[in-house]
Amino acid sequence: MADDSFDAIVVGAGPAGCACAYALARYGRNVLLLERGNEPGAKNVSGGRLYAYALDMVDPELRSRAPFQRRIVREQIMLLNEGGAVTVDHHDPLGGGEGADSHSVIRASLDAWFAQEAEAAGATVASGVKVDALLEEGGRIVGIRAGEDEMRADIVVAADGVNSVLARQAGLFPDVKPHAVGLGVKETLELPDEVIDARFGLRDGEGAARVAVGCTAGMAGGAFLYTNRGSLSLGLVVNPEQAGRSGRPVQELLQDLKAHPAVAPLVEGAVPVEFSAHLVPEMGHDGVPARLHREGLLVAGDAARFGINTGLIIRGMDLAMVSGLAAAQAILASPTRAGVGETYMRRLEELSLLPSLRALRNYHGLFGIERIFGAYPALAGDVMRFLFRVDGSVPAPMLGGIRRLATSRVPFGQMARDAWKGFRCL
């Protein structure tokens, strides 16, 4: 490849990179898609859930071929305490309705499939390639260097993950800061489909997505559980700074979660087949760097720190695909290299990615209310236990009993301040 030249080189065969390469190849551009792992998906980690609208935006015909696991029809929220949980279960047989459906996915399968689709559309896909540096001439990015090979292109798209080496080398933004990311760990647990259906109240092809708080030893973060075909994806995301100070390995927290009385029956008998860890963007709009392009370079996906976490909804893959599509559309629409960056930013606006981040930018402030991750889930358990307790004694007045329980966990003044802060975040 030493003397190869391309219209575009895309670094990273995740959702952003594959979407970009696929869209460019469909329109006849000579595009090279590079993946550091031995194959696409080998180094990518996700819980994982894909909101299908993003795939439809890239190409509606992809949906029928995509390796979806299960269509999510149950949304579940768990507030865990030491001995039990308060669980909210929303069952929607329509799975969100037309255009709003989502599916559990296995990233290794999804990324491998998407890269194959890009290759079938005409892209060149090369795996096991570590990009060491960008090539720069006269202040412009003109290609990449991988080992002894130099590959040139009109445009390079950096889709190389949250700790993007290329974006840092280009001077677009510094090293990722611990407070700006979450440390995610995940186990894939094999379990027969009929057992999954019975435990989660599902029928064939239906899936459940569950989020939980109260399981991170008071640290900012939470848990997720997705049902797949023949397996479960169970994991935790915590603040890495707090995890480091706590001295507790995150893997230990994950094992504690599996043993929790509200979780253990769901995973009983499941066989662990994979463990993985990954950094994920956590700051939402405020974590997106001010500059996402230089002449000859665009930054997309996790590398651009695109992510949304409201506590109820966690979005990453859909934003990555949309940003990859935006990058491809900008390249296709721009007659000169100099104008691609501004066109890219316009497409991120027009495809609703940046407006969505702005609309939800305050949600991250909720994670600054430390009692959400310990005291309040415990309080929810106290209140429910009080409401349902019948022991033959004279019942306490409901309002007074709840007030007594609440103030035993959190002083009233602190609760009022937390409520006001939470209200402002929403």
Residue ranges of predicted features:
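N-terminal Rossmann-like FAD-binding beta1-loop-alpha1 element of flavoenzymes
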Residues: D4-L33
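Conserved Rossmann-like nucleotide-cofactor binding loop
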Residues: A16, E39, N163
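N-terminal FAD cofactor-binding segment of flavoenzymes
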Residues: G37-G83
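Short beta-strand to alpha-helix junction loop
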Residues: G95-Q116, A243-R248
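Predominantly flavin-linked oxidoreductase catalytic cores and closely associated redox partners
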Residues: E117-V263
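FAD/FMN-dependent oxidoreductases across multiple families
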Residues: T216-M219, R229, Q242-S323, T336-T343, ...
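Active-site-proximal substrate-binding core of FAD-dependent oxidoreductases
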Residues: A326-F373
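C-terminal auxiliary extensions adjacent to catalytic cores
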Residues: F367-L426
